Curated annotation (Swiss-Prot):
Protein name (Swiss-Prot/TrEMBL): Histidinol-phosphate aminotransferase 1
GO-annotated molecular function: histidinol-phosphate transaminase activity; pyridoxal phosphate binding
Top-rank lineage group of the source organism: Bacteria
Record's keyword terms, sorted: Amino-acid biosynthesis, Aminotransferase, Histidine biosynthesis, Pyridoxal phosphate, Transferase
Keyword flag Nucleotide-binding: no
Cofactor(s) needed for function: pyridoxal 5'-phosphate
Known pathway: Amino-acid biosynthesis; L-histidine biosynthesis; L-histidine from 5-phospho-alpha-D-ribose 1-diphosphate: step 7/9
Complex and partners: Homodimer.
Entry EC no(s): 2.6.1.9
Catalytic activity line of the entry: L-histidinol phosphate + 2-oxoglutarate = 3-(imidazol-4-yl)-2-oxopropyl phosphate + L-glutamate
Residues with PTM N6-(pyridoxal phosphate)lysine: 209
Any one of the GO BP annotations: L-histidine biosynthetic process
Family: Belongs to the class-II pyridoxal-phosphate-dependent aminotransferase family. Histidinol-phosphate aminotransferase subfamily.
Amino acid sequence: MSRFWSPVVRTLSPYVPGEQPKQDGVVKLNTNENPYPPSPRVLAAIASAAERLRLYPDPRATRLREAIAAYCDVAAEQVFVGNGSDEVLAHTFPALLKHDRPLLFPDVTYSFYPVYCRLYGVAHEEVPLDAAMRIEIADYRRPSSAILLCNPNAPTGIALPRDAVAALLAENPDRLVVVDEAYVDFGAESAVPLVAHHDNLLVIQTFSKSRALAGLRVGFAIGQRPLIEALERVKDSFNSYPVDCLAIAGAVAAIEDEAWFLESRTRIIASRDVLTRDLAQLGFEVLPSLANFVFARHRRRSGADLAAALRQRGVLVRHFKKPRIEDFLRITVGTDEQCGRLIEVLRELI
């Protein structure tokens, strides 16, 4: 701590990302990264774009916005891109979520949301998930300025169907609904088709998970034009060039190679099903996930003890020391070999 810290900094509890190990040979199942590499076309596009590094990137990332728009069947002016979906979220809070009434989001969800609230001074209320760790739409019928949902939810992996999101929008025409769809490509239904009918919907997605571009940092939002304009106004008051030319080139190439994307996604979903079965056979309760991870707890072993024991044996999973979920482990769906090693170690421990 320094005497030069502002009052805001003194009260912050920053987000803590998953561990990035320095040593080789670790089975890394703690940060929900894609276990498979990006498309070779992505690597070729990045190499080709390197010669333009002396130039500033397009501040509007027009080529990328047009590619996303074509893929999602929306207009380019309905797309906002940023340096990962975390930056898109970071702009969303001051642009659209800071009002007199509180923002609502689940009590068990992406832990960056309360961090952004504290950083930007956004009043918020946490709405408890039900006993099955599900979001109940009826619980959001309370005074608020906006609703923020991660769908599929993190860290549970449980998803709301599109018609439930549509019902939420219909019940709240005067409140903004933000749907964070970082994991939507692994089996859930996207809310993007609802944007055309609801001016109070903003959908946020990322290239980090299903497109295997976590190291490139590309995210985007889709909404009707006034919402996108609000994000642009905040971005241009902060940094006019958030997405670099390599990221633009790589992300466009990732969209263009649909076959690679579909193959990777299919393999992850199949591995998730096997991992869920194997964990259940070891006595774990596994929540029904539509993400690239599973959320599980053992009936006789604490989550903290299991996470520590796994780490000692070279297997990293994510444990959250938080009420209601302290006995759960969030386990990324890795390759079949990685998941097999996890199960092998768990058999030894249990």
